Design a protein with these regions (language model features):
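Terminal domain-initiation and capping elements
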Residues: 2-100
């Protein structure tokens, strides 16, 4: 009976995926309650943390709500936007690269 030999090669050039900031933009129509709901539902924040982030969005005009790999950030942005539109809110979300 022969024995198979396993050869392990190091992976060269593997990089971390680029990280992107998900930014909520304040508007005069999307309710604070709806924003809090999206932060809890889509980003798993507690209600208290979501409320604090929502206050920042309201006060500063925008706020970073998460930093995630590009594909995940893009999908979250799409999901939240679709949810907002289906509830007749104009919530705007943008993605920006996280600079290191």
């Amino acid at each position: 009976m022969s024995h198979a030999e396993t050869i392990t090669k190091p992976i060269i050039g593997l990089q971390e995926p680029p990280m992107f900031k998900i930014i909520y933009i304040n508007d005069n129509q999307t309710t604070m309650e709806f924003v809090i709901d999206t932060l809890v539902s889509f980003f798993n924040y507690t209600t208290e943390t979501a409320f604090e982030i929502t206050k920042d969005i309201h006060t500063d005009g925008s706020a970073v709500v998460a930093v995630l790999p590009y594909e995940v950030a893009e999908q979250k942005g799409i999901e939240v936007t679709v949810h907002a539109r289906s509830n007749n809110f104009p919530l705007q979300i943008k993605l920006e690269p996280e600079l290191v």
